[in-house]
A protein has these predicted regions:
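Glycine-rich phosphate/pyrophosphate-handling loop used in enzymes and phosphotransfer proteins
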Residues: 1-199
Length: 199
């Protein structure tokens, strides 16, 4: 990814929803996207808007296994977002079938690269027990991920949960709920990209 391409990735400019990080018309604690919903994470932040260029980058490292793009995406995140005030990073686990087909977990690659940038440990604290495919899913299908995760160990600390793209927040919230139930004091969500809908 050249410098020009990196600069062309859409920035997510304030004002933002304080909770989910959605672009808003004026600063709010919770926007229409997340108001009235149970959200288990303290806040979510993304480095870029999910446009055609960001989508190409994400799909290239997810489906084609281009490790260098995960590293470059992490560099963009580290450049555009401040390090989270946490004790460790973890990642949204891929479902077993997809992980075996790809030979890797895209969110784990991103998290491990970010851990290097931010000098934080990265630990596999979750496993997926059901479901997994979000691309092409309807909003209701995306929100049906409750109970999709299990904690692999207690998490009595502050955690940053890393994923590639924030769409509805359902996956992030379901994973955060599991981390909180396992003892995490707080969970922040960090993604490379997020769907852009000014609310």
């Amino acid at each position: 990814m050249c410098t020009g391409c990196r600069e062309d990735l859409p920035r997510i400019e304030p004002p933002l929803c304080a909770r989910c990080g959605a672009p808003v018309v004026w600063p709010v604690e919770r926007c229409r996207e997340c108001a009235g919903r149970r959200i288990a994470f303290a806040q979510a932040r993304a480095a870029v808007g999910y446009d055609a260029a960001a989508r190409c980058i994400v799909l290239s490292w997810k489906e084609r296994g281009l490790r260098r793009l995960a590293a470059e995406a992490a560099a963009v995140v580290a450049e555009r977002l401040p390090p989270p005030d946490v004790d460790a990073l973890t990642f949204v686990p891929a479902d077993r079938t997809r992980r075996l087909a790809r030979g890797h977990n895209p969110a784990e690659r991103l998290a491990r690269e970010l851990a290097h940038h931010w000098e934080l440990p990265c630990e596999p604290l979750l496993e997926r027990v059901r479901g997994g495919r979000q691309r092409g899913a309807t909003r209701d299908e995306r929100r049906s991920v409750r109970g999709a995760f299990r904690a692999t160990s207690p998490s009595p600390r502050r955690i940053a949960l890393v994923d590639d793209v924030y769409t509805t927040g359902a996956t992030a919230s379901a994973a955060s709920t599991t981390l909180r139930a396992a003892g995490a004091r707080s969970v922040e969500v960090v993604t490379f990209a997020r769907a852009l809908r000014r609310v």
